[in-house]
């Protein structure tokens, strides 16, 4: 009697703790089935397809809604909780990890595409072009990246990014200019028949989208400042800590809707795709990209984690399953960030002082999957054009793909723009980016999964490397009440019956009956 009852309790506990994950998996399967059936047996108009995907659109809007408060509150509280020297060390370790894994991903992608040669058996004319090629200047894109790191208006940075465009100056424009015009004039030589120079003026514009890079830079500095202000800054620390907790409560509500939204996202995308024949034409190219992403996520990242942390990396990855599924469905590292926080902190028990500092930065600059994809795509397009790349050009692709992926968050319409930058760096025709746009929506989902997994492993690795500094801060927090994550020991109800440390809601939680000063960590 005892054993069946215990098995029943274990099953109920498993379902209770993993109902969201299981329902998401079921939603993915149902979404694929419904999408295929609707595509085969109904003839929906473009308007009908738009309405069909509406529940999925609502999920995306809700997730994007919490990105801004989550990034701002988590970055500020995370940095304020750390000593400036400690935060510098943690930041350096995180950036080194991001840089090394991105370089490894690029090298892996180039090795695979050079070995498999997916573009050798095909010609440019055999593949249909989709979309248009954006006009991109590498210099302007890099300068825009730096400009966006230092926004001139903090409120505007919450919904717009700075972007420069070039406009050709004609003779009539030149005579009509007045003294109040603020645009900068640049002169460049172009290959025209008269072999004359053309004049361009650089015009600054703003495009829609959160300036994540600028907000992170500001929050980093702001968090360091209020962390050093002592008791004067404590009220701000408490405010942003409460904002972070409130945002995560909202995330819990959103995740209850997630299975339904994901079902319609998947089904809607399957119905929307016009030409499935393109997948056959670009099949070998897709296999090359997916093979690289699989090797990087299943072999390289877990190996790095195991070498540093000395724990089972696949158990850690299992704790991130919900975040990885979300990334696969919605194809956005930033929109997945709320789920990534929950998985890292509640499933894998990573220190909040690490996750709140490392994850927002990782979601912005750590793009292993994107770097690998861009390197493979550049060499693939070179093979389509029968262009033999030299060692110098391959190195150029590697460096450019790494830099472009790191700076992608600070560049408006980053996907196409960064790809054009990589192609232009080695003299490949920028318009050939339209050859791979048709399958980009699918590959983008898988490379987002790799990006999120890399961020997650990064928190575990940085936490291990920073263990000594965190323990020293735990000791000093007994006399330093400024730390918003002052240590409280909590016994976690798990099978190991070990006493683990939980960083809960601030250093003033003395009376646990006080709902304002004490908040329990919620579970899935």
UniProtKB/Swiss-Prot annotation:
Top-level taxonomic group: Eukaryota
Compartments (UniProt record): Cell membrane; Apical cell membrane; Synapse, Synaptosome; Early endosome membrane
Catalysed reactions listed for this entry: K(+)(in) + L-glutamate(out) + 3 Na(+)(out) + H(+)(out) = K(+)(out) + L-glutamate(in) + 3 Na(+)(in) + H(+)(in); K(+)(in) + L-aspartate(out) + 3 Na(+)(out) + H(+)(out) = K(+)(out) + L-aspartate(in) + 3 Na(+)(in) + H(+)(in); D-aspartate(out) + K(+)(in) + 3 Na(+)(out) + H(+)(out) = D-aspartate(in) + K(+)(out) + 3 Na(+)(in) + H(+)(in); K(+)(in) + L-cysteine(out) + 3 Na(+)(out) + H(+)(out) = K(+)(out) + L-cysteine(in) + 3 Na(+)(in) + H(+)(in)
Entry keyword annotation includes Transmembrane: yes
Extracellular membrane side: 39-61, 115-205, 267-286, 381-393, 428-440
Amino acids binding Na(+) 2: 364, 405-406, 408
Membrane topology: Multi-pass membrane protein
Intramembrane region coordinates: 314-344, 394-427
SUPFAM superfamilies found in the cross-reference section: Proton glutamate symport protein (SSF118215)
Residues annotated as transmembrane: 19-38, 62-82, 94-114, 206-229, 239-266, 287-308, 354-380, 441-462
One GO MF term: cysteine transmembrane transporter activity
Positions bound to L-aspartate: 331, 333, 370, 411, 447-448, 451
Cytoplasmic side: 1-18, 83-93, 230-238, 309-313, 345-353, 463-524
A GO-annotated cellular component: early endosome membrane
UniProt modified residues of type Phosphoserine: 517, 522
Record text about domains: Contains eight transmembrane regions plus two helical hairpins that dip into the membrane. These helical hairpin structures play an important role in the transport process. The first enters the membrane from the cytoplasmic side, the second one from the extracellular side. During the transport cycle, the regions involved in amino acid transport, and especially the helical hairpins, move vertically by about 15-18 Angstroms, alternating between exposure to the aqueous phase and reinsertion in the lipid bilayer. In contrast, the regions involved in trimerization do not move.
Miscellaneous comment as given in the Swiss-Prot or TrEMBL entry: Transport does not depend on chloride.
Subunit structure: Homotrimer. Interacts with ARL6IP5. Interacts with RTN2 (via N-terminus); the interaction promotes cell surface expression of SLC1A1. Interacts with SORCS2; this interaction is important for normal expression at the cell membrane.
Job of this protein: Sodium-dependent, high-affinity amino acid transporter that mediates the uptake of L-glutamate and also L-aspartate and D-aspartate. Can also transport L-cysteine. Functions as a symporter that transports one amino acid molecule together with two or three Na(+) ions and one proton, in parallel with the counter-transport of one K(+) ion. Mediates Cl(-) flux that is not coupled to amino acid transport; this avoids the accumulation of negative charges due to aspartate and Na(+) symport. Plays an important role in L-glutamate and L-aspartate reabsorption in renal tubuli.
Protein name: Excitatory amino acid transporter 3
Lineage: Eukaryota, Metazoa, Chordata, Craniata, Vertebrata
Gene that this sequence comes from: SLC1A1
């Amino acid at each position: 009697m005892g054993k069946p009852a215990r098995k029943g309790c274990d099953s109920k506990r498993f379902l209770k703790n993993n109902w969201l994950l299981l329902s998401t998996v079921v939603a993915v399967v149902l979404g694929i089935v419904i999408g295929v059936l609707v595509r085969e047996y109904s003839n929906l108009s473009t308007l009908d397809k738009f309405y069909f995907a509406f529940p999925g659109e609502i999920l995306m809007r809700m997730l994007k809604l919490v990105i801004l408060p989550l990034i701002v509150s988590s970055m500020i509280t995370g940095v304020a909780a750390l000593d400036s020297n400690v935060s510098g060390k943690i930041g350096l370790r995180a950036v080194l990890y991001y840089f090394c894994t991105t370089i490894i991903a690029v090298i892996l992608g180039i090795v695979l595409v050079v070995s498999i040669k997916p573009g050798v058996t095909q010609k440019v004319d055999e593949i249909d072009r989709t979309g248009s090629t954006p006009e991109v200047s590498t210099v302007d894109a890099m300068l825009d990246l730096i400009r966006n790191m230092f926004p001139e208006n903090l409120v505007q940075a919450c919904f717009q990014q700075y972007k420069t465009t070039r406009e050709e100056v004609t003779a009539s424009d030149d005579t009509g200019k007045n003294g109040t015009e603020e645009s900068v004039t640049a002169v460049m030589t172009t290959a025209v028949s008269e072999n004359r120079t053309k004049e361009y003026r650089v015009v600054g514009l703003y495009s829609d989208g959160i300036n994540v890079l600028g907000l992170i830079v500001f929050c980093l500095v702001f968090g360091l400042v209020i962390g050093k202000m002592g008791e004067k800054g404590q009220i701000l620390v408490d405010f942003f800590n409460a904002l972070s907790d409130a945002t995560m409560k909202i995330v819990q509500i959103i995740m209850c809707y997630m299975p339904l939204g994901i079902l319609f996202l998947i089904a809607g995308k399957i119905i929307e795709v016009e030409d499935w024949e393109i997948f056959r034409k670009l099949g070998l190219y897709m296999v090359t990209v997916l093979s690289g992403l699989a090797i990087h996520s299943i072999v390289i990242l877990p190996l790095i984690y195991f070498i540093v942390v000395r724990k089972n990396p696949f158990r850690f990855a299992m704790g991130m399953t919900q975040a990885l599924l979300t990334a696969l469905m919605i194809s956005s590292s930033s929109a997945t960030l709320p789920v990534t926080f929950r998985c890292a902190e509640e499933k894998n028990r990573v220190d909040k002082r690490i996750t709140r500092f490392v994850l927002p930065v990782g979601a912005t600059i750590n793009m292993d999957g994107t770097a690998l994809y861009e390197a493979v795509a550049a060499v693939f397009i070179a093979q389509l054009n029968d262009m033999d790349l030299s060692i110098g050009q391959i190195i150029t692709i590697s460096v450019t793909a790494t830099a472009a992926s790191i700076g992608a968050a600070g560049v408006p319409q980053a996907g196409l723009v960064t790809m054009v930058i990589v192609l232009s760096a080695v003299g490949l025709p920028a318009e050939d980016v339209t050859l791979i746009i048709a399958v980009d929506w699918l590959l983008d989902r898988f490379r987002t999964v790799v990006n999120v997994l890399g961020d997650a492993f990064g928190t575990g690795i940085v936490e291990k490397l920073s263990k000594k500094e965190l323990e020293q801060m735990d000791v000093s927090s007994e006399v330093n009440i400024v730390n918003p994550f002052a240590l409280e020991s909590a016994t976690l109800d798990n099978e190991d019956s070990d006493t683990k440390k939980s960083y809960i809601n601030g250093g003033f939680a003395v009376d646990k009956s006080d709902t304002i000063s004490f908040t329990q960590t919620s579970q899935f």
